């Protein structure tokens, strides 16, 4: 019996089972399931290379984070815009190439309706200028454009804070500002202070109406406007350290062709030596009195480029000095802090007149 049972069990291994339709074959007892797939585990925070989840470096991650915050400068809430400016102030990058993106986003906020946003923006401009010297000069065209727009803005609060931004340029980029935007800045100042360049009845009546509508906040803001005007005139009408350093070079030593050759050379500080000849100007005189008088007139302001010191002085004396002195004298009579600042501006103009007299005597 035992032998028959053993033979029957051995025979089962060689018997092919009959499968029913629709059913799979039975799996053997020693079957191993291999249908699973392995999953990788990623730990980017513990990576030696210190890369983010997207595989970018820390510098690229900072740029991406900065781009996100710069997009919030156009947020509808003024509190959010202020917080973004504070964040940018605290996380200014050391890479100068990122500042182009920063200035492109924050410069339009000069015209922001919120006073807190504009105040924070002034601090941010100063921080950028201190961290990256010369960075404001690279973006001075767009900055000056928005500053002049703020100085002539319809909103009085925006006009009141406009000279705070102008003061930043006077402190950190005085030469670039005076060379490229002296005439435009002076004309914007006349609009800001409700002054007139001409004595015609229409302009005078408009100035009287505008000054009568000035509120208390605007009158208080005139103190800051006059203080910045004083600094602007000092930087534009008097030689700075860079100009004096250039003037120390004696052309007679450099050019040794003839002992008096320097008398016939064009000064290096003069950008438009032949501008009075108007060789490239296609314009007709509006008044016969303006012909060959050797002075600049209001009609010439749109075509003047006052890049050198002599041209700026001549433009100021011929066009701006008389109305500026007239309006400053009226402010001096008011007294108080406004009169004190106006008197300091008059001191700058008096110093200019004395220096011009010395130059005329030396010639």
UniProtKB/Swiss-Prot annotation:
One Pfam entry name: Ipi1_N
Any one Gene Ontology molecular-function term assigned to this protein's record: chromatin binding
GO biological process entries: maturation of LSU-rRNA from tricistronic rRNA transcript (SSU-rRNA, 5.8S rRNA, LSU-rRNA); pre-replicative complex assembly involved in nuclear cell cycle DNA replication; regulation of DNA-templated DNA replication initiation; ribosomal large subunit assembly
Nucleus in keyword set: yes
One of the record's GO cellular component terms: cytosol
UniProt-annotated location(s): Nucleus
Keyword rRNA processing: yes
Region (Disordered) residue spans: 1-38
Annotated SUPFAM superfamilies: ARM repeat
Family the UniProt entry places it in: Belongs to the IPI1/TEX10 family.
Protein known as: Pre-rRNA-processing protein IPI1
Organism: Scheffersomyces stipitis (strain ATCC 58785 / CBS 6054 / NBRC 10063 / NRRL Y-11545) (Yeast)
Lineage: Eukaryota, Fungi, Dikarya, Ascomycota, Saccharomycotina
